[in-house]
């Protein structure tokens, strides 16, 4: 389990969110069988999403989704996080890999390639606010800082790091976001800039000094004051960070309705049932022939649970209007239920 800290620095001129996510990223690596550089890419994005959730989400039931689409061999990635420290994510090509950079570091930018970052903020009402910005470097941290400035008008410094060892297991992972508050004094910004230039890198600091030590180095001379989270029920004064998926057997079984009855019967004949793998977390669900044959014509959004297709009392099927769900996901219905041209 990881952890998230919040606080202020520079006598309130800087808002700070920091996360230690080593266990979270390692679980993602194991679940998806990620290559070392894919681990770094997804790990940075997951950590960044946790930081943005603390900075941007206004109510507990909101969620933030990062979608990175690039031309590199990774093929893109998707990450979702909430304000409670829950995060999940996946990459399109988990075993994709590229050579190390000349300095010996993982080349996340080349693995991601050129492209765009899309950020969705999903509200409890079903509304979704979406912003898209071009990728600056594909290294994730710079791209998130660029997004915060371009789309949210929030000048920020974002540091993200994932270090792997041995066969690719995660040695340390974490991140820090420093938001400049309106009216921040010039001397505070100058000190922050000087501290950033003097940093040896986030991952060496996390490995040698831990999260608190990294914050001390980054905010030296700026008087970091940690926010007391105990009033919110976090008795350790930190928010636990966990890899947590919202999939379950019911949702997995519903996914089979996207196959025709003939295709589902073929699964039963050839495989003795059906198997569904969650793309978010890699969880495998296996279903018996009886469970597969029990399917009714009902389709829900895999992300928010909204009914896309369901039987009415007269035996006809009711379909959702439009091509986009209220959460922003593209509506995909089984071929046999789509209106014929």
From Swiss-Prot:
Q: Which source organism?
A: Thermus thermophilus (strain ATCC 27634 / DSM 579 / HB8)
Free-text function comment from the UniProt entry = Redox regulated molecular chaperone. Protects both thermally unfolding and oxidatively damaged proteins from irreversible aggregation. Plays an important role in the bacterial defense system toward oxidative stress.
- Fill in the PTM field for this protein: Under oxidizing conditions two disulfide bonds are formed involving the reactive cysteines. Under reducing conditions zinc is bound to the reactive cysteines and the protein is inactive.
- Alphabetically ordered keywords of this record: Chaperone, Cytoplasm, Disulfide bond, Redox-active center, Zinc
One Pfam family, please name it. Answer: HSP33
Q: Which GO terms describe its molecular function?
A: protein folding chaperone; unfolded protein binding
Instruction: Give the record's family classification.
Output: Belongs to the HSP33 family.
The protein, known as:
33 kDa chaperonin
State the disulfide connectivity. 245-247, 278-281
**What CDD domains does the record point to?**
Hsp33
Q: Name one GO biological process term.
A: protein refolding
Q: Name one GO cellular component term.
A: cytoplasm
Where does this protein reside within or beyond the cell? Cytoplasm
């Amino acid at each position: 389990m990881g952890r998230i800290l919040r606080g202020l620095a520079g006598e309130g001129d800087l808002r700070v969110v920091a996360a230690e996510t080593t266990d979270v990223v390692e679980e993602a690596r194991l679940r998806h069988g990620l290559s070392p550089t894919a681990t770094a890419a997804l790990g940075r994005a997951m950590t960044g999403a946790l930081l943005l959730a603390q900075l941007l989400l206004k109510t507990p039931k909101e969620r933030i989704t990062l979608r990175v689409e690039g031309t590199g061999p990774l093929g893109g990635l998707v990450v979702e996080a909430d304000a409670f420290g829950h995060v999940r994510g996946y990459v399109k090509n988990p075993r994709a890999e590229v050579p190390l950079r000349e300095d010996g570091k993982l080349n996340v930018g080349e693995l991601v390639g050129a492209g765009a970052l899309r950020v969705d903020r999903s509200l409890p009402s079903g509304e979704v606010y979406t912003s898209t910005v071009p990728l600056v470097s594909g290294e994730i941290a710079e791209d998130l800082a660029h997004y915060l400035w371009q789309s949210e008008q929030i000048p920020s410094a974002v540091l993200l790091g994932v270090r792997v060892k041995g066969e690719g297991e995660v040695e340390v992972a974490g991140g820090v976001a420093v938001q400049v508050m309106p009216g921040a004094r010039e001397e505070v910004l100058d000190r922050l800039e000087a501290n950033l230039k003097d940093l040896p890198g986030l991952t060496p600091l996390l490995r040698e000094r831990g999260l608190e030590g990294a914050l001390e180095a980054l905010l030296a001379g700026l008087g970091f004051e940690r926010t007391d989270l105990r009033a919110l029920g976090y008795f350790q004064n930190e928010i636990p960070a966990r890899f947590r998926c919202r999939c379950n057997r019911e949702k997995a079984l519903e996914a089979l309705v996207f196959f025709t009855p003939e295709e589902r019967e073929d699964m039963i004949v050839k495989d003795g049932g059906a198997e569904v793998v969650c793309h978010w977390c890699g969880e495998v669900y296996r279903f018996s022939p009886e469970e597969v044959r029990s399917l009714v014509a009902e389709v829900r959004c895999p992300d928010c649970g909204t009914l896309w297709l369901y039987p009415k009392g007269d035996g006809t099927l009711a379909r959702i209007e439009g091509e986009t769900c209220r959460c922003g996901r593209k509506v995909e219905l089984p071929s046999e239920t789509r209106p014929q041209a």
